[in-house]
């Protein structure tokens, strides 16, 4: 029995399903999860000593690669002075200043510890600011596991939930909670316009992933985002961009810089923690002024602005501002996506791929999808076979057909070549 299997068997005795986040259980693809012992650069090693080229990157944060010396040094130096204080630090101010500098739509920012906290708090703030209850979200967009957002929420919920009904995607979420959440089709401008026409003056906020990464990678169209901005402005609703995944991942200023759109509030995470638990939400000063202790919208967190997370985040933000960083990252990611598509075509496999910044999506279907419905028509059985073949050849992809992939600054040409050679073998195997 492999060491991975031994650990999985042991884990299931004390951890529900043997994992602390459902997608890690390999339920979608089958087989035994890999228990990771260490990682460096673009590689990870499992408990059996197998090395993998990593295209998960801790689900996005590891944009400069695993265990980057400057990030490690920053954490070690901070840890020498204690791990947490429960009091303000100068580093928190520096982090806030850096975020506001790099993302101009953010005039003030509040640090939290997870993406779920960021989106949950941003929605509460939007409701408090507008005095309205109704929220619009979109099919396939995942904004964390807050109750009001678990409706057709993409990601692991595509694996575990019934997606045919406009109902909570998770047991334990009362229908009364989600009745204030309206779910619309991603990239459907007409449907969005109709919603605003029918509910004028009732909508507190629209929340959206500008590049959805939790129903695989699906880009928002320019027309969709433009309409969203115009409708929110006209109706007095708050536009929230969930950039937990895309922030500092698709461009230095996030997806909003790529698209040229200015939201009212932005949610960040992943990259800003450099692999540590950290997230943030911020935006217009007049909206943020409603947040406690200034205003009546309550939000708090014991570990918010944790010194170790802030240190890792600041070190990462410094590294990604190097000249040419994003040009090279985007080039390598596009090279990977195009190479995978070419390998599939040569093998006669229906397949498409897309890339933006350091994110990519692979789809076992003809054409790049533009909506949740199109994504769900992918050939998941074929993806599962491909996933295991790649794993056998030392390439670690996301263990779900409904997750985006991530490239780091450490994925050089030799690593891409090894990945594409593995892909050619995997496609040939069927």
Swiss-Prot record:
It is an enzyme of class 5 (isomerase). Pathway: Porphyrin-containing compound metabolism; protoporphyrin-IX biosynthesis; 5-aminolevulinate from L-glutamyl-tRNA(Glu): step 2/2. GO terms for cellular component: cytoplasm. Its EC number is 5.4.3.8. The modification N6-(pyridoxal phosphate)lysine is found at residue 270. It catalyses: (S)-4-amino-5-oxopentanoate = 5-aminolevulinate. It is found in: Cytoplasm. The keyword Cytoplasm applies. Its cofactor is pyridoxal 5'-phosphate. SUPFAM superfamilies: PLP-dependent transferases (SSF53383). InterPro entries: 4pyrrol_synth_GluAld_NH2Trfase (IPR004639), Aminotrans_3 (IPR005814), Aminotrans_3_PPA_site (IPR049704), PyrdxlP-dep_Trfase (IPR015424), PyrdxlP-dep_Trfase_major (IPR015421), PyrdxlP-dep_Trfase_small (IPR015422). GO terms for biological process: protoporphyrinogen IX biosynthetic process. Homodimer. This is Glutamate-1-semialdehyde 2,1-aminomutase. It comes from Cupriavidus necator (strain ATCC 17699 / DSM 428 / KCTC 22496 / NCIMB 10442 / H16 / Stanier 337) (Ralstonia eutropha). The lineage of its organism: Bacteria, Pseudomonadati, Pseudomonadota, Betaproteobacteria, Burkholderiales.
